[in-house]
Amino acid sequence: MFLANVVVIGAQWGDEGKGKITDLLSRSADVVVRYQGGVNAGHTIVVDDRVLKLHLIPSGILYPDTICLIGSGTVVDPKVMLGELDMLIANDIDISGLRLASTAHVTMPYHRLLDQAMEKQRGARRIGTTGRGIGPTYADKSQRSGIRVIDLLDEQRLRDRLEGPLQEKNELLQTIYGVAPLNAEDVIQEYLGYGKRLAPHVVECTQTIHQAARDRKNILFEGAQGTLLDLDHGTYPYVTSSNPVSGGACIGAGVGPTLIDRVIGVAKAYTTRVGEGPFPTELSGSLNDQLTERGGEFGTTTGRQRRCGWFDGVIGRYAVQVNGLDCLAVTKLDVLDELDEIQVCVAYELNGERIEHFPSSADDFAQCKPIFETLPGWQCSTEECRSLEDLPKPAMDYLRFLADLMEVPIAIVSLGASRDQTIVVEDPIHGPKRALLSA
């Protein structure tokens, strides 16, 4: 029976716990589509006490009957992707459902070298890139000089497509950044080898999705990073090079907006950010250390410590608006268990005035001071709670406050990394467009 096509997006700066929520929802999905980003994003899934860290491959790969498609809007590092496939095989996970869009762009060795060299040259003006070559790959895509997955399947086409860009990048690496040039033949042979291994998984992205839609399959679109890292709608220039927002699903997967039935946002019960850029609710000292330790706040991709802060309702409301969120999944509520009081940012002060919107200027955003409301903590463990009735009253009050502040119902509450540490308030795919936990 046809149920729904759903987009899952991050409602903050990424690292919200989308991997767990997507894993949960993938049980009801026939097709899971990753629609943007590359190996600069990571998600962690815990299965039978095994911790699996993925960067490119969708969480749905854990379900043998689910098709997992890496869409046209992604940028693919084939070496990393094949490493993930080998890791999954070693863990006895069936990878036959994996599909890779023929039109996805490929991260080449010079993209990584340029990314790292440019970030180093920026010095104090660095933007916090992961150094994985994502920005340069997307730049080549925009300049129509990129290499696509389909090019790896034909030696002559790869040679023809690579000749000009590689010569240009070698000159740039040598002349501007003092980096040794790449050998063309070595690169060609390496990437032809990747192409041979990936060939059985390569498909036409749009055709695959629309066939699934015609067959009335349930399709789950999985975004990477988060709303505030969106190239057009985030805290520019401290953003990624793609569009993690819900609208990016249509572009990156090759579907029209009428195919999307529901948009689910994922947000932590507090806020984190990796890398540079303004962060109004950022904490320091012992509180920051406590959230970092209890939340395990280190990046899946880079290992960098995440910056921690109180929940920011201003960016939360903005995420609801930009993405058209129908409901919200709140993760890591358990991280707040030991606090005697919890603060929530409800507005900003900018130049002496109260504002309740997200400013478009990064300079203005850096000057914003948070206006907080303080709520009581619950100072007891929520990790074993499996229903709303199990939650302590202050925790319920906190969730209701967030739902009211963001003007969106909460459908899922996560209380730990394991699949069973989850409260489903209403089924966000099968149920009506509402949730029980709302103001």
From Swiss-Prot:
The lineage of its organism: Bacteria, Bacillati, Cyanobacteriota, Cyanophyceae, Synechococcales. Plays an important role in the de novo pathway of purine nucleotide biosynthesis. Catalyzes the first committed step in the biosynthesis of AMP from IMP. The keyword Membrane does not apply. Belongs to the adenylosuccinate synthetase family. One of its GO terms (molecular function) is GTP binding. Its EC number is 6.3.4.4. This is Adenylosuccinate synthetase. Its cofactor is Mg(2+). It comes from Synechococcus sp. (strain CC9605). PANTHER family: ADENYLOSUCCINATE SYNTHETASE. Substrate binds at T300, T301, T302, G303, R304, Q305, R306.
